[in-house]
Regions:
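Helix-coil boundary and interhelical linker segments in multi-pass alpha-helical membrane proteins
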Residues: 2-7, 11-22, 71-79, 139-153, ...
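Double-stranded RNA-binding/processing signature
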Residues: 41, 49, 70-71, 75-76, ...
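Loop-to-transmembrane alpha-helix initiation sites
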Residues: 80-86, 150, 181-188, 203-213
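The feature marks the first
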Residues: 21-60, 68-71
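Structural signature of hydrophobic alpha-helical transmembrane segments
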Residues: 19-31, 77-90, 149-162
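Transmembrane alpha-helix boundary signature
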Residues: 68-73, 97-111, 143-146
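Short, amphipathic, aromatic/basic-enriched membrane-interface segments that mark the entry/exit
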Residues: 18-26, 52-55, 118-126, 176-185
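Transmembrane alpha-helical segments of multi-pass membrane transport proteins and ion-pumping complexes
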Residues: 31-39, 60-61, 65-69, 88-101, ...
Length: 232
């Protein structure tokens, strides 16, 4: 009996470590992806290096800060552990340097056109990766921090973690938030949220998280490929 209990404890600890490691990966992916997204919009708006840094950082940590305020984890994680802030700052500077180097050679119309296509593709990729990673991370953080199984709370915090940074980014850049336009954006989050919430009751949490992450990616790319949009 004691051996069985001992094995169960170790199994639970192993699962917790796996989930924690996966969430750390999601956190890094989301931080880099959203920092790229924010930095690129700042470049498009012809901001200076400081503006690029601000938009990169805000896009990266903004959703997580809102999440922490909602669930009562204060001060927000971005102040308790500045890892994401540092990652997003470095990413923003790297994006700025790459853009400056590339911009010196983008003189012909053909290269300028190619640059514009590359900009939109990279923006879509980074935004989608950040959206998927932070949506699942927001849900998992809520479940663990509040020890709750309330779907509406978990779903709301997951959604706001995913889209919050992008909303702040767009407002600072003087644009209508992307999530409020016709694009399949928050809708993709909802599919991932529902998938993760259902599956984590039946399969290992890290597997449920990966499937939820992939669902967000899949819906976003299918929407882009088939030009799905919400009516307006």
């Amino acid at each position: 009996m004691l051996n069985v209990l001992h094995l169960q404890v170790h199994t639970q600890e192993g699962e917790n470590i796996n989930v924690t490691n996966l969430m750390s990966v999601f956190e890094i992916i989301g931080s880099i992806a959203f920092a790229i997204s924010g930095s690129m919009l700042a470049i498009k708006k012809e901001m200076d290096l400081f503006g690029i840094l601000i938009l990169g950082i805000v896009t990266s940590v903004g959703g997580g800060a809102i999440r922490d305020i909602v669930i009562g984890n204060t001060p927000p994680a971005m102040f308790q552990n500045p890892k994401c802030t540092v990652i997003s700052s470095i990413t923003a500077v790297v994006v700025f340097i790459i853009w400056k180097i590339h911009n010196r050679h983008a003189v012909t119309e053909k290269i300028a056109r190619h640059t514009d296509i590359m900009y939109h593709n990279l923006l879509f990729l980074s935004d989608t990766l950040g959206l998927a990673a932070f949506t699942i991370l927001g849900m998992e953080t809520t479940i663990r921090f509040l020890n709750t199984d309330q779907f509406l709370l978990i779903a709301f915090v997951g959604l706001i973690t995913g889209v919050g940074g992008g909303i702040l980014r767009d407002l600072l850049a003087g644009e209508i938030p992307y999530v409020l336009q016709k694009h399949i954006y928050a809708t993709a989050c909802i599919f991932g949220i529902i998938g993760y919430y259902i599956l984590y009751h039946f399969i290992p949490e890290n597997a449920a998280a990966l499937i939820g992450f992939c669902l967000v990616l899949a819906i976003r790319y299918l929407a882009k490929h088939f030009e799905w949009n919400l009516p307006r």
